[in-house]
């Protein structure tokens, strides 16, 4: 069964590659702005579902334009589509930390995480897609990808920061690493110097809880095989 990772994150691509899985990559663009007072679980569940819908729509556009026929992996069926979203969550359990929009936003996040423990949450959704015929008029049909099954998991990891000084924050921002990362830091990069300890999955903090994601893929693959056998 073919796997498509719908993510522009190089960190998620690298992690999934470590499992020696063959997969195709597509990028999706959605509005990731949290709703007012939206709780962390509600936010990341909404994000991975929205990314899956956007990816399915993109695949159908490619199929209609015959672009998909240039890629063998998009011709097999069914497909497992993986979407993921990572956020930081402050000790209040309510405040969502996404990618900082600017220096001031990053400083505000870091000041709240300094010398304390926050959580990193990652939601992963596995969506099973299958080709079906859609009637375009009374006589004609066209193939479309349809969502036939989906499952989500959420992994949480506790991360404790040392006390941060203004100079540390300034130097880190100027280095360019924080801008595209939830919570404004990368534990796999220079941000590791701020982490005194973690409790839970390290790869979850990087952006994809690898062991849990592989278990999810296996579960979805087995389910799809059973469905095909029953059919």
Curated annotation (Swiss-Prot):
Main subcellular location of this protein, as a coarse class: cytoplasm
Could you say which cofactors this protein requires? a divalent metal cation
Active-site residue numbers: 85 (proton acceptor)
Subcellular localization(s) per the UniProt record: Cytoplasm
- Which EC number(s) does the record attach to this protein? 3.6.1.9
Task: Give the GO terms filed under biological process for this record.
Answer: nucleotide metabolic process
Which GO CC annotations does the UniProt entry carry?
Answer: cytoplasm
Q: Name one GO molecular function term.
A: UTP diphosphatase activity
| Catalyzed reactions | dTTP + H2O = dTMP + diphosphate + H(+); UTP + H2O = UMP + diphosphate + H(+)
Supply the alphabetized keyword list: Cytoplasm, Hydrolase, Nucleotide metabolism
InterPro entries linked to this entry: ITPase-like_fam (IPR029001), Maf-like (IPR003697)
Instruction: Name the site position(s) for Important for substrate specificity.
Output: 11, 86, 188
**Top EC class, one word:** hydrolase
Q: Which HAMAP family match?
A: Maf
**What family classification does the UniProt entry report for this protein?**
Belongs to the Maf family. YhdE subfamily.
Its biological purpose is as follows: Nucleoside triphosphate pyrophosphatase that hydrolyzes dTTP and UTP. May have a dual role in cell division arrest and in preventing the incorporation of modified nucleotides into cellular nucleic acids.
Q: What is this protein called?
A: dTTP/UTP pyrophosphatase
Q: Which organism is it from?
A: Psychrobacter arcticus (strain DSM 17307 / VKM B-2377 / 273-4)
């Amino acid at each position: 069964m073919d796997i498509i990772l719908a993510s522009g994150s190089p960190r998620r691509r690298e992690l999934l590659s470590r499992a020696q899985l063959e997969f195709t990559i597509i990028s999706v663009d959605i509005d990731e702005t949290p709703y007012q007072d939206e709780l962390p679980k509600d936010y990341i569940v909404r994000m991975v579902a929205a990314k899956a819908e956007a990816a399915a729509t993109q695949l159908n556009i490619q199929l209609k334009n015959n672009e998909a026929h240039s890629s063998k992996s998009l011709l097999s069926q069914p497909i497992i589509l993986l979407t993921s979203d990572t956020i930081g969550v402050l000790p209040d359990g309510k405040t969502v930390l996404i990618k900082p929009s600017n220096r001031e936003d990053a400083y505000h996040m870091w000041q709240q995480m300094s010398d304390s423990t926050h959580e990193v949450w990652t939601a992963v959704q596995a969506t099973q897609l299958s080709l079906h015929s859609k009637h375009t008029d009374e006589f004609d049909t066209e193939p479309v990808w349809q969502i036939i099954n989906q499952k989500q998991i959420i992994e949480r990891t506790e991360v404790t920061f040392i006390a941060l000084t203004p100079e540390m924050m300034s130097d880190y921002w100027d280095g360019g690493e924080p801008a595209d990362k939830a919570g404004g830091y990368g534990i796999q990069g220079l941000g590791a110097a701020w982490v005194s300890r973690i409790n839970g999955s390290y790869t979850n903090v990087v952006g994809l809880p690898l062991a849990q994601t592989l278990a999810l893929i296996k579960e979805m693959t087995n389910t799809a095989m059973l469905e095909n056998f029953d059919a």
